[in-house]
Swiss-Prot record:
Originating organism: Homo sapiens
Domain named Ras-GAP: residues: 1004-1253
Positions bearing Phosphoserine: 539, 1424
InterPro entries: CH_dom (IPR001715), CH_dom_sf (IPR036872), IQ_motif_EF-hand-BS (IPR000048), RasGAP_C (IPR000593), RasGAP_CS (IPR023152), RasGAP_dom (IPR001936), Rho_GTPase_activation_prot (IPR008936)
Molecular function terms, GO-annotated: actin filament binding; calmodulin binding; GTPase activator activity; myosin VI light chain binding; small GTPase binding
Lineage, uppermost ranks: Eukaryota, Metazoa, Chordata, Craniata, Vertebrata
Gene Ontology BP terms: ERK1 and ERK2 cascade; G1/S transition of mitotic cell cycle; gene expression; mammary gland epithelial cell proliferation; mitotic actomyosin contractile ring assembly actin filament organization; negative regulation of gene expression; positive regulation of gene expression; positive regulation of mammary gland epithelial cell proliferation
Keyword Transferase among UniProt keywords: no
Cellular component aspect of the GO annotation: cell cortex; cell-cell junction; cytosol; lateral plasma membrane
SUPFAM superfamilies referenced in this protein's UniProt entry, alphabetically: Calponin-homology domain, CH-domain, GTPase activation domain, GAP, RGC domain-like
Keywords, sorted A to Z: Calmodulin-binding, Phosphoprotein, Repeat
Phosphotyrosine, modified sites: 162
Ranges for domain Calponin-homology (CH): 34-149
Protein name, UniProt field: Ras GTPase-activating-like protein IQGAP3
Amino acid sequence: MERRAAGPGWAAYERLTAEEMDEQRRQNVAYQYLCRLEEAKRWMEACLKEELPSPVELEESLRNGVLLAKLGHCFAPSVVPLKKIYDVEQLRYQATGLHFRHTDNINFWLSAIAHIGLPSTFFPETTDIYDKKNMPRVVYCIHALSLFLFRLGLAPQIHDLYGKVKFTAEELSNMASELAKYGLQLPAFSKIGGILANELSVDEAAVHAAVLAINEAVERGVVEDTLAALQNPSALLENLREPLAAVYQEMLAQAKMEKAANARNHDDRESQDIYDHYLTQAEIQGNINHVNVHGALEVVDDALERQSPEALLKALQDPALALRGVRRDFADWYLEQLNSDREQKAQELGLVELLEKEEVQAGVAAANTKGDQEQAMLHAVQRINKAIRRRVAADTVKELMCPEAQLPPVYPVASSMYQLELAVLQQQQGELGQEELFVAVEMLSAVVLINRALEARDASGFWSSLVNPATGLAEVEGENAQRYFDALLKLRQERGMGEDFLSWNDLQATVSQVNAQTQEETDRVLAVSLINEALDKGSPEKTLSALLLPAAGLDDVSLPVAPRYHLLLVAAKRQKAQVTGDPGAVLWLEEIRQGVVRANQDTNTAQRMALGVAAINQAIKEGKAAQTERVLRNPAVALRGVVPDCANGYQRALESAMAKKQRPADTAFWVQHDMKDGTAYYFHLQTFQGIWEQPPGCPLNTSHLTREEIQSAVTKVTAAYDRQQLWKANVGFVIQLQARLRGFLVRQKFAEHSHFLRTWLPAVIKIQAHWRGYRQRKIYLEWLQYFKANLDAIIKIQAWARMWAARRQYLRRLHYFQKNVNSIVKIQAFFRARKAQDDYRILVHAPHPPLSVVRRFAHLLNQSQQDFLAEAELLKLQEEVVRKIRSNQQLEQDLNIMDIKIGLLVKNRITLQEVVSHCKKLTKRNKEQLSDMMVLDKQKGLKSLSKEKRQKLEAYQHLFYLLQTQPIYLAKLIFQMPQNKTTKFMEAVIFSLYNYASSRREAYLLLQLFKTALQEEIKSKVEQPQDVVTGNPTVVRLVVRFYRNGRGQSALQEILGKVIQDVLEDKVLSVHTDPVHLYKNWINQTEAQTGQRSHLPYDVTPEQALSHPEVQRRLDIALRNLLAMTDKFLLAITSSVDQIPYGMRYVAKVLKATLAEKFPDATDSEVYKVVGNLLYYRFLNPAVVAPDAFDIVAMAAGGALAAPQRHALGAVAQLLQHAAAGKAFSGQSQHLRVLNDYLEETHLKFRKFIHRACQVPEPEERFAVDEYSDMVAVAKPMVYITVGELVNTHRLLLEHQDCIAPDHQDPLHELLEDLGELPTIPDLIGESIAADGHTDLSKLEVSLTLTNKFEGLEADADDSNTRSLLLSTKQLLADIIQFHPGDTLKEILSLSASREQEAAHKQLMSRRQACTAQTPEPLRRHRSLTAHSLLPLAEKQRRVLRNLRRLEALGLVSARNGYQGLVDELAKDIRNQHRHRHRRKAELVKLQATLQGLSTKTTFYEEQGDYYSQYIRACLDHLAPDSKSSGKGKKQPSLHYTAAQLLEKGVLVEIEDLPASHFRNVIFDITPGDEAGKFEVNAKFLGVDMERFQLHYQDLLQLQYEGVAVMKLFNKAKVNVNLLIFLLNKKFLRK
């Protein structure tokens, strides 16, 4: 069945009954509402440009507010930014349904429609949408919004679809039921236009008349009349354009006709008014705006058609379009973008259409984005060029990484390479553009990736980067990948690159080089094969051709030597074949090269020999003996026995030999020389060239002497010369004769000289005088030589003389210094102090102080050597604490086991009594009941004594311990719940979980939860600091509520009680500041006093009231009273900081720190306003306004504050509130502007108050809680919680576990897996209690003793060893640097110590040892440090070097920076010496206290264990039969049962491998042991002992606790555990 196009007429109802008419009416209402939904859906689709659900589903899709918020963004983007819309993709909504944060979307939409000015008459409530309380009102608001936006030209017009759409009968019925279910009435959708018109603050009658005139003019169809009617000022129409008058007429006429037609389709004709057929003022304005927009779009299209940026800009700035963000300088961008959009639309539609307004707006936004990006890119490129010119690599990389530059990824590690390459490119090309930078950076980044792959030895990454097109490398071959990799690695190693990178040129050069090498190797192999083939062919010419191939790489291959090459290579190949035994053996390249070299050497030798022989022949022909002798000694000819003295003989002999060979007709030029290897070398005497083959057709010269012939002639001549030397035997006689002749000649010459002297005596005297002068000069020179020989002695004498002079001068200066010693001391002290200050400043502030500065202050460490011992003691105490904790954990586990055993014994005793009382009623047929009665704690709930329930209980205890001590889980859970359930959950579960902070531990943990939750809420929900003030944050609300009750209430009473009481007791106090109120009060008093009516008007404005001096006087008095009272309140508040609850102050501190961290750009004033809002407005202000509600003052029963009292408190609260928020009076409170100075002054006081309030210690210090607190505490924490709260908490954790613990390795998941599925309330309380008929089982309370499943501290031995190693190294280094000079650590450790240094070091160590001897015994536990200090300096140096290698292996120090990290550690120790000592002392005290507490806990556990042991023994002894009844010292008798008897009792189930017929032959003897609870079971078969079994009563109870029904004896007999316990109880134990 489908709904007809039009509703039924009134005639249809004449034939229907009352019920049918009522049903028809409901169907009609449902159809009308569905039509409105369809209209709203289509209008929203037009606005949002996306498809929406069907009308029947639209209501549900609106509840999360996403569509509404998107709609708000369409017309008010500044109010509803897209990024603020929660769950914009609706993924969260589709997964888990509605969330409380979806209400934010609804509020955004309401803010948007309020922002544009839609009358509040149409506004729905948030709950109308979120809870679906009144969806028709929401649709009504959407319709009103559509008409309002249409009037403003911001949205299309909504269309009336009544009677035009069809719905199924099921849809109509469902909608009618839905409307009837909520009892909702449809709003009058048709009256929206009239309501909007009535909302105008103008003369409604004039507007109505003008609108009617317009409608009538439109009906007449006269354009001029219509335009005149539209221009009537009473019509309040805007943006009228005369050129469009005809279009207005046509559009309005069409709209009026459609509206009239739609009105005729409606059934409720009696309720229709004139505006159902006439256009309203809003509709007329909307159509005008629509026409204006269309006309403006045509202008835009015309500008695009003309390609005119100026015309387009003017068209875009048309107010009718109301485009956002149009900028004059982007006209070209607009033209380009809108042209592109226009062409794309034409292609899609197949024809040219005008762009819609939204499309133009989108194009403007896109063009703005592109323009901004382009401008930002150009600015970024300018900055990059400037940075490149500055040559600061870090700045260049920073600018390159700027996103606005639109460049590929940049890697800062290669900053120097970017700087260098880009600087070179900039020098070559000038200012770099974006495209050039893009290509360059892309290439350089690819080069960086290649370098990083090389550094990491990553071959695959290297190859992928190398073949990347961005790298731009040419001729990269895949088969050479490994060669490229190896070659580049080798290049990096050769250059010794550390942090430097290979450049692109290096990469390309290496690639080309590798390619060339590869090609060269290929060609070389081919050339070698061709050479071998030529040798096989036996052709010297082919061999020469192959040798001359460039690829072979053979040098000095020449044509004349070709036969020799071929001969030698063939011989070498033949020899290789013989040696290897391979006939096909070939010569390798090196062997070929050796053959070529040998052939060239042979040719050179033969050539030089031939030249030498030719030279000899030529010299012989010239007849010059000396020339002949010289050429004979030519080494190239290698002639033997050539003697220089035989030159003439050689000449004669060789001339004779040549004459004998001379032939008259011999004119040939070729001669033959025989070589040593039997080959012949042919030499041309004219060209001096030789060859290895005889030239064809050329005769040889026979008259030319050969080398052999020349050698023969030389040998003969030399032999003859040797014979001639025999005459040397008579040489002595010749010498004697010559001596006598020489003596005669000398004597003759002497006589002649004497005669000459006598003749020339004056000349002789003169000569003697010259001789004496010479002698005197010689003596002088001798003295001079003597001085030179004794130079050291002379220098020493001179030094003594100079020393005397210098000493005299020194003594004079020393005397001067002694006279001015005070001034000198001051100067030196000032210099040393200044130097020490500079060094200390470097030590304190420098990140890496030099070693020389550290050495200057290293002596400070000597004064605190006990610090190192204390550190060792600290480590020892930590280890002892860990061991103690583990020991206590083991004791605790043992106590738990003993506790279970005691419980089993007690429960067994109770069960035994029940069994005995019913034992007589049992028969053979109901033995199973006996077994059931022996089951302990059957169905008694969570705390029943069974293993399964025990594990469930422990799992809950572990879970709630984790929730209590790890606040992040509850903090996240709070924000996963709907907002209306959060407060209930907090009060019902969380405050119970923390026992309402009744102890130090719970107060500390609850405060940690508040801190974590507040940080989580600010992180996820707060977009700006002011949101905390304007909103109502969940955590802030809960914190204030918690701390304002109980102790917080008493604090409020202490702070505000006295001043509030003063206000209440002052009956004449007047603080009214309203001028009108004061004015009326004055008139009333005047009339009451005079009895005459005042002539003044009663109703006046504030300004008129203030014109009367009496009113001003009263206002001044009220203001003085208000300021005086406010000062009292301010003083009470600001002087009571310490009385504000600590938790409240700490939360304020966390709020301040968290806001400052999330909003670093926020000013201190903004943050202080938020914190002040928390401390004053939320915590203190309610107590000021309503003290009776917070029991600040005592009120009589039924009493209340009087109105004047409440007004006075409200006035004070308002003033304090303005002061706390820093808000001044303005606007309607102009008369209070005199208080603004006071508010500003008071605000500064509030800021100081807030600052002091936030200065609180951390909770760990406040509550004396640390990581050992739970381990030291003897009593375990307990919580009391109802079963319903337990189940609800478990359910919530299961539902939201993935949100609050995303990591599946989180401990929460493990604990939830331990708990398993969600239990029911009867499962937790037990079926027996559930059957008792409690009205509300969920309110039954259970107690949980919280325990930590993950408790335990792992002592990190490696960490302790590392710290000890570092500590020892630092101490050794501190000792070394005080005695060794040097600027670096390596230099100091490599120097040898002198005797003086060793002595000074030994003296210091002796003093330290004496100091250590006085150290108390508890600090002497680690003696290794003391032992190290006694080592000599050389050994300490070796120890430090070894330790440095170990520390470097651990990654703590690095040799690259000279172990600066260790020097920094020493500097840090010196800086933190005093602070560290106090902190370590406090840590030692804390650990000692912890150790003492653990010892106390250990003693408690041991005592409790002893007590439990005694109690168990007592229980067992009590169960044993009384010794009096059995006789003292008498042993209890044994029981004897056959297997058949035990089978009949149900105790025995079966015996494996033994039929039941033989059971009568098996006897079981049960004998009590010496200790209570122990039994010995002896099995006999046919009277023969077979097996013995020790049975422990507690083991049986443990099996029963674990739910084991059957156990084995002797590994064969199966017995019923419950019935066996019953049998032992009955026969051996007391009843």
